[in-house]
Amino acid sequence: MKNKSKLKKIKEKKPSIAKLPSQWLFVAKEDVTARDVKNALEDYEGVELEIWEAAGIVEVVLSDGKSIDFEQTEADLRDEYSNAFLAKEQAKALFYVTIHPDSAQLVMPVMKHVIGKIPGLFCGDTDDFSPFVR
């Protein structure tokens, strides 16, 4: 009896989805600006876009009301390891990207759309830059 009860609990357990980091980097292989990121998303359905051009910020509001925020920064992460990574990826422009981890199903297609228009990649703002979206 004891084993059947345990088996039932295991079957009822919902599969867990790995949480994405909330902080990302968008490493662009072209010298682009916040305006270019906004333009790349103009034809993406189901999002609202807002830009603060002077600050280099683009807000992408998703259909669930949460947002993806792009903040343009200097392509220099101020440490040798990180800058070697940027050089390897041929970074010409860099954006800090903030997402809501619970919106992964909405965020990932947006990231893929951006890199379909602007060559580059998204990577976690983590010690090893993972995960990657190429």
Report residues per predicted region.
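Short, intrinsically disordered low-complexity segments
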Residues: 29-102
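Acidic, proline/glycine-rich low-complexity IDRs
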Residues: 1-23, 28, 32-48, 98, ...
